[in-house]
From Swiss-Prot:
Residue numbers bearing the 3-methylthioaspartic acid modification: D89
Statement: the UniProt record of this protein carries the keyword RNA-binding: yes
Keyword set includes Transcription: no
InterPro entries: NA-bd_OB-fold (IPR012340), Ribosomal_uS12 (IPR006032), Ribosomal_uS12_bac (IPR005679)
Oligomer and partners: Part of the 30S ribosomal subunit. Contacts proteins S8 and S17. May interact with IF1 in the 30S initiation complex.
Cited function: With S4 and S5 plays an important role in translational accuracy.
GO BP, sorted A to Z: translation
Protein name (record): Small ribosomal subunit protein uS12
Amino acid sequence: MPTINQLVRKERKKVLEKSKSPALKNCPQRRGVCTRVYTTTPKKPNSALRKVAKVRLTSGFEVISYIGGEGHNLQEHSIVLVRGGRVKDLPGVKYHIVRGALDTAGVAKRTVSRSKYGAKRPKAGAAK
């Protein structure tokens, strides 16, 4: 424990919080261009082909971001909106692509949790 005199000479060091999504540069979302769209496999014990895209952001960073939902229309040179949020079973994937924004289409025939997947509200009689 330091003495009062030691604290007067040199104050306590502030604990700095490290950002979980540094490429966004404190913005809620960033626009970017897909440089590669591909699938990758998750860590053990999970097994799947997860859809991801390498995106060059307007902040200058190139990040790997996850494409959520069933099916997508993304290809190279698509303009996308990227938000923070990691994927636990994909190492190095710390960002998500926002569905229904810019070139990314919403998930078709989605009826629950629609706002998360950019799906419009279905017509009254069509959903049954």
